[in-house]
Amino acid sequence: MRLILLSGLLLLGIFLANGDEVDREGKVVNSLIDALMHLQREFAKLKGSFLIVHKARSFGSGSERMYVTNKEIKNFEALRQICEQADGHIPSPQLENQNKAFANVLERHGKEAYLVVGDSANFTNWAAGEPNKAAGACVKADTHGSWHSASCDDNLLVVCEFYFIL
């Protein structure tokens, strides 16, 4: 919405900077208002389309979170930077259906990936004998969604988590 308002102000500023005659009949202002209303309608359509796609993807995975890979293989620190740059997060499944959606990505690619486990996690999916701190300070998920302790230096599939507050 701010972008639309700024666009309208920019158009008005361009008109005034050109030194054109004063718009006594308000034609320019009315034209700007029409353009602004058009931009608002287009923005509403785009927002609606985005929400439809998001809801469809959420319905298909059973999760309000999306897990996406760029197919790169990186260590934990590189993953953190990549997800941060993409405005995403390192996967942190909080529910069984989220873990299943995450595991579906891993199964499709036949690879393991890092995840983070919060201190107050109500949901966990540790494999038998895990967590095993001797194996490392990080956590990885296998293609079945089971969690294992891992070295943070392991090179695993890059998967970032994206979620939306609707």
UniProtKB/Swiss-Prot annotation:
Pfam families: Lectin_C. It is found in: Secreted. Disulfide bonds join 83-160, 138-152. Expressed by the liver. The keyword Lyase does not apply. One of its GO terms (molecular function) is phospholipase A2 inhibitor activity. Keywords: Calcium, Disulfide bond, Glycoprotein, Lectin, Phospholipase A2 inhibitor, Secreted, Signal. It comes from the Eukaryota. The keyword Nucleotidyltransferase does not apply. GO terms for cellular component: extracellular region. PROSITE patterns: C_TYPE_LECTIN_1, C_TYPE_LECTIN_2. Residues 1-19 form the signal peptide. InterPro entries: C-type_lectin-like (IPR001304), C-type_lectin-like/link_sf (IPR016186), C-type_lectin_CS (IPR018378), CTDL_fold (IPR016187). Its main location: secreted. Residues 46-161 form the C-type lectin domain. Glycans are attached at residue 122. This phospholipase A2 inhibitor binds directly phospholipase A2 in the presence or absence of calcium. Homotrimer; non-covalently linked. Belongs to the alpha-type phospholipase A2 inhibitor family. This is Phospholipase A2 inhibitor A1. It comes from Bothrops neuwiedi.
